[in-house]
């Protein structure tokens, strides 16, 4: 699926103060008490209050075909929080919705002002409102008890990309949107079939319309439909239920992501990846034990004073750009939420990337032709770059206005403290894991001093040490040594307004010092200070801005620096997910190139997962990767499209070879 350009909804406002779509000439909600209609049509006809109280699972999943102002979601959230506690601890709501033309934040605020009784719920939605970037945006509410997946883009393109188990995903559908007469492109048989494909057996469905072709289409898709009394003056509407169904799935069997085992999760790590995974797991009620090699968290690659937060985009507008643009939004939301409750040094001052030579300028120019909204990326001329940066650069470039810098160690500690507050996370420091063994019902790990832990599920998120801990996975990852220099500020450097990226990066001042870096030593793991790398960090800035005087004020002579080692992959994407049994893979998929129809699910080491290869963009990718892994282990809806899940799968290197008929070795 390629990345497509979106534009915001164009609104008019009628005499009743109701938003009206300029594209479709239809209201977003009824002039006559839209909230009452929502409660009657969608909550009551899907029997939700009773089902919230007595659901047979710890998670209830609702799907919706048109998000609009979010009124349906907010009313559902209010009802869930009122009813669900009766079903016991751990009851969670997952709401999946689609929107082709997202509102602007200000239009959303104005529309929802009509419902002051929902202000407690609408304010967090407004605060987290995503950028208009195509794909799935995951938002969190009520301390993680409620998750909203907003799929921005045409539902015809998005719906087939929603990953789901073979027996379905959705417990109740809201078939909403502008009326079939005003928006016929949405109300198609392909849509009805897609709703049925994602529906679990006996899932319910409700819609405000009673159009005959809608009823017939839903019946043809596999729903048993009936006419019921409509809301208010509307005579009739439709409600129904999904019958038994044949198993169907979106994800290819060789990229399978089955749910993990019930029970505790062990995590080996101590940096931002393990912290974010632990947080996402405890939000789902899982008990987690985090085994950290060091005496405190974030002493490895996550321990720098300042790190840049911005998406990794390219001119190809491929899975790389799509993943990082979505990960960036989730990372910002996590940062802002955690910083409200824990001390995190950060500044969303923006990031400026310079076209410092012909090659980099051409790369940025190609990237600028892509489907990225100005809220995510803006092209800067040379004068504009100087104004934004605060210092003359001699080059134009691009700005990421919602990016900035943060202290990785602070964010890691904040995520751990937040998870510990639940009472579900135990952190064991000074624990170097040296052995692990697969058992019939889980995994056992052993530390160097002979202590042992056992759990049904094991996550290895140990940075560059990951391949050594699970050598049998043979993941083609490599370590990268990086030295970041800490330099005192100066008269000129103190004027730096944004993070500045060139063939390196320079951060604005924090505690009268800047970070400049970083060196790049592939397949190097030593942590010794190197004077030549200190000099190189300064030299790269001067080489990229040769006509400017202020880079000479960067003083590295104090030899203040920090060295870390990160893990990277050759395709610049993380590895997130289950670990395949490489010993079985070749025989299992011997004929995969010629016979993909009858392929069996990927042979796995049950209960074993990895999260790694975050490279230099861990601040951007770690929160969403941790959320993905927790979703997978718990059997929740996954926060990415199917093709992005394939691109992140740890087995992708081997499966691609087999699909081409090549040997694994």
UniProtKB/Swiss-Prot annotation:
Tell me the GO molecular function terms: flavin adenine dinucleotide binding; oxidoreductase activity, acting on the CH-NH group of donors; tRNA (5-methylaminomethyl-2-thiouridylate)(34)-methyltransferase activity
What keywords is this UniProt entry annotated with? Cytoplasm, FAD, Flavoprotein, Methyltransferase, Multifunctional enzyme, Oxidoreductase, S-adenosyl-L-methionine, Transferase, tRNA processing
Catalytic activity, EC: 2.1.1.61, 1.5.-.-
Ranges for region FAD-dependent cmnm(5)s(2)U34 oxidoreductase:
268-665
Q: Is the Cell division keyword given for this protein? A: no
Which SUPFAM superfamilies does the record cross-reference, listed alphabetically? FAD-linked reductases, C-terminal domain, FAD/NAD(P)-binding domain
- Listed InterPro entries: FAD-dep_OxRdtase, FAD/NAD-bd_sf, MnmC-like_methylTransf, SAM-dependent_MTases_sf, tRNA_MAMT_biosynth_bifunc_MnmC, tRNA_MNMC2, tRNA_S-uridine_synth_MnmC_C
Q: What is its main location?
A: cytoplasm
Reactions catalysed, as given in the entry: 5-aminomethyl-2-thiouridine(34) in tRNA + S-adenosyl-L-methionine = 5-methylaminomethyl-2-thiouridine(34) in tRNA + S-adenosyl-L-homocysteine + H(+)
* One Gene Ontology CC term in the entry: cytoplasm
GO biological-process terms attached to the record: methylation; tRNA wobble uridine modification
Does the keyword field hold Heme?
no
Q: Where is this region: tRNA (mnm(5)s(2)U34)-methyltransferase?
A: 1-243
Please list the cofactors this protein needs: FAD
Q: Which NCBIfam families match?
A: MnmC_Cterm (TIGR03197), PRK01747.1-2 (NF002481), PRK01747.1-5 (NF002484), tRNA_MNMC2 (NF033855)
HAMAP family, A to Z: MnmC
Q: Which family does it belong to?
A: In the N-terminal section; belongs to the methyltransferase superfamily. tRNA (mnm(5)s(2)U34)-methyltransferase family.
Quote the function comment for this protein: Catalyzes the last two steps in the biosynthesis of 5-methylaminomethyl-2-thiouridine (mnm(5)s(2)U) at the wobble position (U34) in tRNA. Catalyzes the FAD-dependent demodification of cmnm(5)s(2)U34 to nm(5)s(2)U34, followed by the transfer of a methyl group from S-adenosyl-L-methionine to nm(5)s(2)U34, to form mnm(5)s(2)U34.
Q: What is this protein called?
A: tRNA 5-methylaminomethyl-2-thiouridine biosynthesis bifunctional protein MnmC
Q: What would be the name of the gene that encodes this protein? A: mnmC
